[in-house]
């Protein structure tokens, strides 16, 4: 019976993913090749260039850009480092530490509990979205910034916007499975910039509501095509580009880059802003044990990190934090070559694992993230720096 239950869960998870592209689509990559018959190997033909930034002199945090690589541990970054020829934008961040990710009731956490600790500074149970262990809603740093500081706020992801990690910053709930309920909470969440996938839970609902129309009635500019992101005007933005998750990187293009830059443009103001950016699908492809797809998602996320760092350097008052909610796949780097930009790996699980994950920081207060912290402490440090 247990085996049947696990199989049903696995099939449900696969159906939630975007459709896997055809092999020919994958071969059109401008920077990489990928062997579909060998999911444990990957080679980059043309690496991307990384940025160089200096630590700003400002000491006060006006803006926070909190970046989460879902399922992205030191293992994934190590593989990406080798595959891109020994270069990553995230390594330009001057401060590094570690975060332990366990939930209150399980050693190996999930995205709801892992994300909730980062978002709120409160450690919680497996499966809970921005609730404390007793089931009470806990205010996230994004929500606190809006309420107390008058900051503008935003989330941009490549998964469903009502999936666990973005939900942890914007809404509350006892289960990630209630995606219609989580989506409905966004109508009154007053988040200024929302970008991702998941239209199925917004306008094809069992209760007949059309949340997209409700958001438009509240003054949101709605965008459903990636090419229209840069053209959007107004003070509030809702972008939903797919029925479920967005497609894998080589098929969707630089959506995360475009949406992140648009978010910064729209949110930047005298009172500051809080923006959460998630590289959502590193986790998905580690669950599937496909290192090539994983690297494509990691590189997409890292290129966004580079542009964020360039903007933060000019601004001088922006704290940038890059971390993960948990590690996925039990990934090991077995062989490879930095010079040849190729890797051979092994996954030990299709699930999460309990390893510490890295924390990188740049900007005012970055030094506070050095060392080893509980994941809830990461959220607490962010709140403390925002409070000064």
PLM region descriptions:
Residues 1-21:
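Bacterial Sec-dependent N-terminal signal peptides
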Residues 163-170, 243-246, 260, 268-272, ...:
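Active-site His/acidic residue clusters
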Residues 74, 299-338:
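Metal-dependent active-site segment of extracytoplasmic phospho-/sulfohydrolases and closely related
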Residues 66, 239-241, 274-278, 321:
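Structural motif
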Residues 121-126, 238-248, 283-288, 360-364:
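Gly-rich Lys/Arg/Thr-decorated short loops/hinges at beta-loop-alpha junctions or inter-strand turns
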Residues 235, 270-274, 317, 326, ...:
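Active-site lining segments that contact anionic ligands and/or coordinate catalytic metals
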Residues 19-198, 203-204, 211-222, 226-229, ...:
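N-terminal catalytic scaffold of extracellular/periplasmic and nuclease hydrolases
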Residues 221-223, 252-267:
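A Trp-anchored, charged/polar loop motif used as the substrate-binding/catalytic surface
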């Amino acid at each position: 019976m247990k085996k049947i239950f696990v199989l049903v869960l696995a099939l449900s998870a696969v159906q939630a993913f975007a459709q896997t592209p055809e092999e020919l689509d994958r071969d059109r990559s401008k920077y990489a090749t990928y062997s579909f018959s060998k999911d444990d190997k990957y080679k980059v033909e043309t690496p991307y260039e990384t940025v160089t930034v200096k630590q700003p002199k400002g000491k006060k945090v006006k803006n926070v850009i909190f970046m989460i690589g879902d399922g992205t541990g030191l293992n994934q970054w190590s593989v990406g480092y080798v595959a891109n020829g020994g270069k990553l934008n995230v390594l330009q961040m001057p401060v590094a530490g570690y975060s332990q990710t366990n939930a209150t009731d399980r050693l190996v956490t999930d995205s709801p509990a892992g994300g909730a600790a980062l978002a709120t500074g409160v450690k919680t149970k497996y499966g809970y979205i921005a609730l404390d262990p007793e089931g009470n809603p806990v205010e996230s740093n994004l929500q606190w910034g809006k309420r107390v500081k008058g900051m503008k706020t935003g989330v941009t992801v490549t998964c469903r916007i009502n999936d666990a990690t973005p939900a942890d910053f914007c809404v509350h709930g006892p289960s990630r499975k209630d995606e219609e309920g989580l989506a409905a909470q966004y109508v009154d969440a007053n988040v200024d910039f929302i970008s991702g996938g998941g239209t199925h839970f917004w306008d094809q609902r069992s209760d007949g509501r059309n949340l997209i129309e409700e958001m438009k009635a509240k003054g949101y500019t709605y965008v459903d095509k990636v090419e229209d992101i840069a053209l959007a005007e107004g003070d509030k933005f809702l972008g939903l580009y797919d029925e479920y998750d967005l497609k894998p990187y080589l098929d969707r293009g630089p959506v995360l880059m475009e949406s992140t830059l648009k978010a910064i443009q729209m949110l930047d103001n005298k009172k500051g802003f809080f923006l959460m950016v998630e590289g959502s699908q590193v986790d998905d492809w580690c669950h599937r044990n496909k290192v090539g797809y994983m690297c494509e998602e990691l590189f997409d996320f890292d290129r966004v990190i580079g542009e964020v760092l360039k903007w933060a350097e000019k601004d001088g008052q922006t704290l940038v934090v890059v971390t993960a909610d948990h590690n996925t796949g039990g990934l090991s780097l077995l062989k490879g070559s930095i010079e040849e930009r190729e890797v051979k790996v092994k996954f030990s699980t299709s699930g999460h694992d309990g390893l510490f994950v890295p924390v990188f920081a740049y900007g005012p207060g970055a030094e506070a993230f050095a060392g080893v912290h509980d994941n809830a402490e990461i959220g607490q440090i962010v709140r403390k720096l925002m409070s000064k």
